[in-house]
Amino acid sequence: MNIRPLHDRVIIKREEVETRSAGGIVLTGSAATKSTRAKVLAVGKGRILENGTVQPLDVKVGDTVIFNDGYGVKSEKIDGEEVLIISENDILAIVE
């Protein structure tokens, strides 16, 4: 993938979610929820502060994160893969 996000943007790939219930039933449609965990594929240079300095991002390529899947999440297909472009503000946690 040849894409570089700008500023405080992060490109992530959503992790696959289990499509079977605990009882073994295959979940489809609205019953199958999308994961809010993702792998970080690329990060921007950082957030530009009011004084003009750039604050580097806390996340780095390869991190697994939990993100807020709401307004402001942009879905794109790049090289045949669906990725999400989000602001670092939409990342809630880094899974360690």
Curated annotation (Swiss-Prot):
<dbReference type="InterPro" id="IPR011032">
    <property type="entry name" value="GroES-like_sf"/>
</dbReference>
<dbReference type="GO" id="GO:0044183">
    <property type="term" value="F:protein folding chaperone"/>
</dbReference>
<protein>
    <recommendedName>
        <fullName>Co-chaperonin GroES</fullName>
    </recommendedName>
</protein>
<dbReference type="GO" id="GO:0051087">
    <property type="term" value="F:protein-folding chaperone binding"/>
</dbReference>
<dbReference type="InterPro" id="IPR020818">
    <property type="entry name" value="Chaperonin_GroES"/>
</dbReference>
<comment type="function">
    <text>Together with the chaperonin GroEL, plays an essential role in assisting protein folding. The GroEL-GroES system forms a nano-cage that allows encapsulation of the non-native substrate proteins and provides a physical environment optimized to promote and accelerate protein folding. GroES binds to the apical surface of the GroEL ring, thereby capping the opening of the GroEL channel.</text>
</comment>
<keyword id="KW-0143">Chaperone</keyword>
<dbReference type="GO" id="GO:0046872">
    <property type="term" value="F:metal ion binding"/>
</dbReference>
<dbReference type="GO" id="GO:0005524">
    <property type="term" value="F:ATP binding"/>
</dbReference>
<dbReference type="InterPro" id="IPR018369">
    <property type="entry name" value="Chaprnonin_Cpn10_CS"/>
</dbReference>
<comment type="similarity">
    <text>Belongs to the GroES chaperonin family.</text>
</comment>
<dbReference type="GO" id="GO:0051085">
    <property type="term" value="P:chaperone cofactor-dependent protein refolding"/>
</dbReference>
<dbReference type="GO" id="GO:0005737">
    <property type="term" value="C:cytoplasm"/>
</dbReference>
<comment type="subunit">
    <text>Heptamer of 7 subunits arranged in a ring. Interacts with the chaperonin GroEL.</text>
</comment>
<keyword id="KW-0963">Cytoplasm</keyword>
<dbReference type="InterPro" id="IPR037124">
    <property type="entry name" value="Chaperonin_GroES_sf"/>
</dbReference>
<dbReference type="GO" id="GO:0051082">
    <property type="term" value="F:unfolded protein binding"/>
</dbReference>
<dbReference type="Pfam" id="PF00166">
    <property type="entry name" value="Cpn10"/>
</dbReference>
